[in-house]
Design a protein with these regions (language model features):
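Thiamine diphosphate
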Residues: 1-102
Length: 102
């Protein structure tokens, strides 16, 4: 079995962190209820741009992913749309225990 792809397929040269920040900037501009909870990664993954553009919609929870999950859950309970961002290895297990308990 064979098939042919139709169209021009080029590799997207943007990296994931820039895509995330661009999407978040767009969402935050369109909806003031969109919140970003950061785990002290503003310089590492370029989310500092979010804090500069929308300081009232950004929370830096520090190096405390479990606490960030609790903050995100609390904000969501008040009607906000929350995106909590951290590295996968730090946002797994213990931090999700916090989300489960919230």
């Amino acid at each position: 079995m064979s098939f042919t792809l139709i169209g021009k397929h080029e590799k997207d040269s943007r990296n994931n962190r820039d895509g995330y920040v661009t999407a978040m900037l767009d969402l935050m501009e369109k909806d003031s209820k969109v919140m970003h909870v950061d785990c002290d990664l503003e310089n590492c993954i370029n989310t500092g741009k979010l804090a500069k553009a929308f300081p009232e919609q950004t929370v830096n929870a520090g190096i405390a992913e479990a606490n960030a999950m609790g903050v995100a859950a609390g904000l969501a309970a008040t009607g906000r749309t929350v995106f909590m961002h951290s590295f996968g290895c730090f946002a797994s297990r213990r931090a999700f225990d916090q989300a489960f308990m919230s």
